[in-house]
Amino acid sequence: MEARAIAKYVRMSPRKVRVVLDLVRGKNVSEAFAILKYTPKDAATVVLKVLKSAVANAENNFNLDVNKLYIAEAYANQGPTLKRFKPRAQGRAYSIMKRTSHVTLVVKERA
């Protein structure tokens, strides 16, 4: 049995989120909490929230044992991009892409 949690439209580049997700993929939930708590990246707070949600979903919806849970899947897909323009010299404008991500975590019980 698996439980999942998704955070959509997170105002952070998927590339930056994937760096943090790579740290916790395949780890036990308790170990992942410890890693995320001391990871000095902004994406760590987002991933921590999603992990807490996934654990709560596993406990409440599927009656899974929290101590046996591990992160089976962790991925960040690209969401819609907010396009902005920055005025530059001599009438030019540079485009700024404010990227968003959809962060998904799947937790399963270890056999």
UniProtKB/Swiss-Prot annotation:
Alphabetical list of InterPro entries matching this protein: Ribosomal_uL22, Ribosomal_uL22_bac/chlpt-type, Ribosomal_uL22_bac/org-type, Ribosomal_uL22_CS, Ribosomal_uL22_sf
Superkingdom, natural source: Bacteria
GO biological process, one term: translation
Example GO molecular function: structural constituent of ribosome
Keywords in alphabetical order: Ribonucleoprotein, Ribosomal protein, RNA-binding, rRNA-binding
Phosphoprotein is among the record's keywords: no
Cellular component terms per the entry's GO annotation: cytosolic large ribosomal subunit
Protein family per UniProt: Belongs to the universal ribosomal protein uL22 family.
Subunit note: Part of the 50S ribosomal subunit.
Function: This protein binds specifically to 23S rRNA; its binding is stimulated by other ribosomal proteins, e.g. L4, L17, and L20. It is important during the early stages of 50S assembly. It makes multiple contacts with different domains of the 23S rRNA in the assembled 50S subunit and ribosome. The globular domain of the protein is located near the polypeptide exit tunnel on the outside of the subunit, while an extended beta-hairpin is found that lines the wall of the exit tunnel in the center of the 70S ribosome.
PANTHER family with a match to the protein in the record: CHLOROPLAST 50S RIBOSOMAL PROTEIN L22-RELATED, LARGE RIBOSOMAL SUBUNIT PROTEIN UL22M
Name of the molecule in the record: Large ribosomal subunit protein uL22
